[in-house]
Amino acid sequence: VGLPTVSAPSETPTALAEDASPAPTGGWSRPLLALAKLALSGGLLAFVLRGTSLDALWQTFRQVRPAWVAAAMSMHGLMVAVSVWRWRLLLDAQQIRVPVRALTESFWVALFFNNFLPSNIGGDVVRIADTARPAGSKTLATTIVLVDRVLGLLALLSVGALGAMGARSLGVDIPGTIWIEVGALAALGLCVLLFFTPTLRNLAFKPLHAVGHPWIAERVAVLQETLDRFGRRPTALAGALAGAVIVQGVIVAFYALTAQSLAISLPLVMAGVLVPVALVLQMMPVSINGFGVREAVFSFFFVRFGLGVEAAVAVSLLGTALIMLFSLGGGALFLLRRH
């Protein structure tokens, strides 16, 4: 489903011209890295499953309750709605008007690519492609998606840091979680640098200008103009950040409801400790879409919560299956676009 053409923001004089210059080309394949990630994911899953009873795991899955599954799926739908609202706030801040329905369809297709490709980059490419025409600039559309990502990262790391502190208060000490707190502070510093300290930001971009390549210079100019406009609209940034925090809360509720669907009592407070930490750790580019890492982290927490490894694996796998099932709707929309 295509997006309607709307006027580009008047504050971007270079937006339309920038795409006329040829882009530098290049690329390489990384099959060895992909194989290493696959091996790690498989190894972690095998390690976790080694300590489980497959019969007990099957019995857990047999207890699934459809009403609770529907409730969990509704949380995923709410997550999409809030995410689209965040995205629209950032587009509006750049004077780009795109209908909510078009953004929702684009985000849903992006979810499909995120869940069925080995990284999240494919989904971002979809979102950029769908908004480049209304924005009048691929660079502008890319910058907006990247800002959305940075704010989402700040929210995730902040909630993850709170989760790590909550785990310590419950007597669950996770080695290395101090780096989540360091990461949250670093993400906050990055946001301040990007949006509210133009002098320092321009110094950071100076090496790119020094390259002297017209293609790079044009895109850096659009990037700086876009960040300047965001800096003049702090309420839009605050709203998008608040939306990102809400998304993290909704994901916590999704996993708590997924556990309930399996007759596993995972209190919301415990889910609020477990899920953010798991999400942060599975961001590490060492596995295929977090497989293995997620199950290992869930097992670590569930054992300490007295719930058992089988329950951890069941909740993790069912949650992943529901997310992938939901994202199949995006795959259907993608096929409709092609016809």
Predicted region positions:
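Extended non-transmembrane interhelical loops and adjacent amphipathic helices
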Residues: D92, T104-R133, A217
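Re-entrant/interfacial helical elements at transmembrane boundaries that shape
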Residues: G123-A132, I288-R304
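Selective transmembrane-helix segments that form parts of the transport pathway or gating/packing helices
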Residues: R149-L154, T320-M324
